[in-house]
Amino acid sequence: MKKAKTAAALLCSACLVLSGTAVPTMADSVKVVTLGADLTQDQKNTMMKYFNVDSNQVQILTITNQDERDHLSAYVPLEQIGTRTVSCAYVKPTQSGGIKVRTANLNWVTCNMIATSLSTSGVKNCEVVAACPFEVSGTGALTGIQMAYETATGEQLDSTKKELATEEMVVTGNLADEVGKNDATTVMNNSKIQVIKDNVQNVDDIYNIVVNVAQQNNVNLDSDQINKIVELLKQIAQQEYNYDDVKATLEQVEQNTSGDNDELGDIDDEEDDTVNAGDSADGDDILNNVDNSALGGDIVESSTENPSLEEESGLTEDDGDDQLSLIHISEPTRLALIS
């Protein structure tokens, strides 16, 4: 069942995979909007309204089901990919501040899961809004966001790191099935911090880090769960990440999942003010510039910059489980859930 959940979840936002035909609308290519090909025109208009941009302000890419198949067939069976592509994203590379993520109508994956996994793919600084006109699970959003970033910057991310990021999302998703999204993200993210920060290569040392992080956060893991995390972190350690490149993102996720939003203290205040002034000088903070009224009421939301948004919008640890099951539901319903 857990494998079925993860496979289904990988598909939910897979339309973000950006090998589809690009339709540049202006010379400014640093911002990219992706729209699922199987959305109606009204739904596409709704997403543009939610992103609060006009078509002449961004580069727009239409993502097809074939794009999903090209990029996801290595991870999930074709019969589970389905035939519809509906999810959307808005991506803006930035110069500093780490990875900032906001989600809407994604009821399984959270902003923190996306942010910490995206850092593994080699992205350093970026603003991301991942959304859909109606609720889907959203784990597959990572793949498309990676590709959107490449399109926006004109630079290719390292293929090994992208694969590790996808694996990280799968491992975290499986763990979330068993211990909850917040605890799963905490163990993965905080263990990754220590491995990268201290350049830990020894497998036994990595094992001890995972065990200690789990114990410190009162997360009960069995040996199989621990070993899967250790194996992934061993591969991540071999990539020799520069901690300064991922620090802002990983420490923000740590802060969010710990529930202590004052933890970073005054040390980062001056830097944060500079970051905000620099990246939002044009008034184009895409995370806080969305128009929620476009999606109507009862939106499931999360934001790395506003951890309370998950609770306020009703995104709980149990949300999404029923949405992901492929058992005993009709084909049209299944396609709607995984697209």
Residues of each region from the PLM?
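Bacterial N-terminal signal peptides that target proteins for export
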Residues: 1-8
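Hydrophobic core
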Residues: 12-20
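Sec-dependent signal peptide cleavage junction
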Residues: 20-28
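Short N-terminal segments immediately surrounding and downstream of signal-peptide cleavage
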Residues: 27-43
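Signal peptide-directed extracytoplasmic domains
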Residues: 70-125
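Soluble oligomerization/assembly scaffold segments of membrane-associated complexes
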Residues: 119, 129-137, 143-224, 230-231
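C-terminal low-complexity, Ser/Thr- and acidic/Pro-rich disordered "stalk" regions positioned immediately N-terminal
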Residues: 264-326
